[in-house]
């Protein structure tokens, strides 16, 4: 027997130390609920679970992002629904105005409502917002830039590629104009119509009675009112009268029939039939810096020029877009370069990782892009044209709403997928990180018994050297 080294006590102490360490870890696992509380518990498992934790947090936020995207789309779609209702009302008013039973005053009243609804559509375009971000003014659509202020892209279809485009403007759009010859009648406010000069003046089907005794200002007011009905501006110079249509293009016309006894005093021709002209644009030959194809076609309506091609390609320009014109004015022919690029779409982060995004594009929706900014229903012809214009506008708004609906459906499916992925990844992380409570309780019980036994055995081992005393005492 040896007393300098108590090997039994050393062994019991070592075992007790290991048992206490294991017992401490078991207590930590049971109290935290985690199998891995530090990297030393499972280095590989710790690395994997931390990556999973990052992904799970990202998936949760991506799901919320997609839900926010749905809210944006619902806000825009709700505004467009109201725009569609207004367009339906405007079309109904056009049908009403086209009826021959209406008087000029009736059509003026109809036009008053049309003008107010047009202004309201413009207001909706400018003020529909989500979280201070304007939705319908084109800010979250693709952008286009040109190298001149005289031509700009008003609208383009989704099939227009991001590229450079070149056109040549060969003629600007013009208004119909009738300029009277000089007449002393317009020079003085004291001028009056004599009985021999009285007669009738017809402007685009609106007849005016010029009576004896009418002063210059009374005559001008009658002419101005008739012109206003027909969307024509009347201006009185120092000694002559000028009539100019408000609209541009071949559809803008001034037809005048003037009694012979009025022609000299008013300075107007006995008859006149003037029309405006449409803008003329030529697409430059396809080249490296021009994305138009050889099959693209061009049509003009006043200042608006539409380029169409295969695959529902459509691009609408406005020529003479700078009003007042630039100084010095740019006169045709001249070349315009455009660039279309993805600079504006709203990018939604709908995934946990970089690049997992979705672009949402909402085009500009206002009277100009809908083609209804200058609808005039004060004549039957204008009312008939209004029906066609509002039909086209309703179709366009419906198409935009359909696209927004497709966006919303996609986002709803994205949310479902994100939530399922989140669920499965959380379950996988749980299998790696979480402790099996039943198994760990059994382990804890075992270690606890061993600790108690180890403590007892260590005490016994420490008592063994005492037996040497009995030998010495014997």
Predicted regions and their residues:
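Primary detection of the long, small/polar-rich alpha-helical "axial" segments characteristic
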Residues: 1-474
């Amino acid at each position: 027997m040896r007393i300098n080294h108590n090997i039994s006590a050393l062994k019991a102490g070592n075992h007790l130390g290991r048992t206490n360490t294991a017992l401490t870890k078991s207590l930590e696992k049971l109290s935290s609920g985690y199998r891995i509380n530090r990297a030393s518990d499972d280095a590989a498992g710790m690395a994997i679970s931390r990556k999973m934790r990052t992904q799970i947090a990202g998936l949760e936020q991506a799901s919320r992002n997609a839900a926010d995207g749905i809210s944006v789309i619902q806000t825009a779609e709700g505004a467009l629904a109201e725009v569609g209702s207004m367009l339906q009302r405007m079309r109904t008013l056009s049908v009403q105005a086209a009826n021959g039973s209406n008087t000029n005053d009736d059509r003026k009243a109809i036009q008053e409502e049309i003008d107010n609804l047009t202004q309201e559509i413009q207001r909706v375009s400018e003020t529909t917002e989500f979280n201070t971000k304007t939705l319908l003014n084109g800010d979250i659509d693709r952008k286009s830039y040109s190298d001149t202020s005289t031509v700009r892209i008003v609208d383009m279809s989704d099939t227009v590629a991001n590229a450079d485009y070149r056109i040549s403007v060969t003629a600007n759009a013009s208004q119909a104009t009738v300029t009277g010859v000089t007449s002393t009648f317009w020079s003085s406010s004291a001028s009056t119509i004599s009985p021999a000069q009285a007669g009738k003046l017809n402007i685009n089907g609106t007849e005016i009675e010029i009576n004896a005794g009418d002063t210059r200002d009374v005559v001008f007011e009658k002419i101005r009112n008739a012109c206003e009905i027909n969307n024509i501006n009347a201006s009185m110079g120092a000694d002559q009268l000028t009539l100019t249509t408000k609209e541009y293009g071949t559809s803008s016309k001034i037809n005048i029939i003037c009694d012979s006894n009025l022609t000299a005093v008013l300075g107007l021709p006995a008859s006149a039939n003037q029309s405006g002209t449409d803008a003329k644009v030529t697409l430059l030959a396809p080249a490296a810096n021009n994305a138009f194809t050889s099959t693209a076609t061009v049509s003009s309506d006043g200042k608006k020029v539409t380029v169409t091609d295969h695959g529902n390609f459509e691009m609408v320009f406005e020529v003479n877009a700078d009003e007042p014109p630039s100084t010095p004015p740019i006169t045709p022919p001249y070349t315009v370069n455009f660039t279309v690029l993805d600079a504006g779409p709203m990018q939604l982060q709908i995934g946990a990782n970089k690049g997992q995004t979705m672009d949402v594009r909402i085009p500009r929706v206002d009277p100009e892009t809908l083609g209804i900014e200058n609808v005039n229903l004060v004549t039957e012809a204008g009312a008939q044209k209004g029906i066609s214009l509002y039909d086209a506008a309703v179709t366009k708004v419906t198409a935009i709403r359909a696209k927004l609906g497709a966006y919303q459906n996609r986002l709803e499916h994205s949310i479902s997928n994100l939530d399922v992925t989140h669920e499965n990844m959380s379950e996988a992380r749980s299998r790696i990180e979480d402790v099996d409570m039943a198994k760990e309780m059994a382990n804890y019980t075992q270690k606890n018994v061993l600790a108690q036994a180890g403590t007892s055995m260590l005490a016994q081992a420490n008592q063994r050297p005492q037996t040497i005393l009995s030998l010495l005492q014997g």
